[in-house]
Amino acid sequence: MTENSNDFSQLRPGLWDTVNERYPDSMITRDELVPLVRPVKTLSESRVTFVSTAGVQPRGTLPFDTVHPVGDYTFRRVPSGSKPADLEIHQLKYPTAGAKRDLNVIFPTERLQELTADGIIAGLSENFISFIGYNMDAERLERTLAEDIADAVEAEKPDVVLLAPA
């Protein structure tokens, strides 16, 4: 899709065909398109929230269950005003050394705060959302965790949601 394109009908035509071919035994298949919505506000007028699979959470909160064989189907709210020193990573499924040196690499709280201070974005939601991406039960992921996260994001009332895998 080009900058001047008026085709906002779907993110990637044929996406679900590719997913369904790659994972033929998956319990979840899709054939409908993924609709896109034309933004109604500029970024400088938009409230932004962030959702990540990095397993980042406020220090002192219940750690994610990183050793359960099918994963952890919970999420954590992370105050958007957090500093990296206020946060920790509970994740065993990817190397975290780089992220521990600079958490903004995977959970950019300070960069988003700077964009707000510079007026690039209007503001941040009260909380960001974090969970661990290692979840082996696709049906449970979709029917519980994804629904819970969607409800939590909706409650933050953002205009824009940034989604980032770890």
Identify what each model region corresponds to.
Residues 1-166:
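Metallocofactor- and cofactor-centric catalytic cores in central/energy metabolism, strongly enriched
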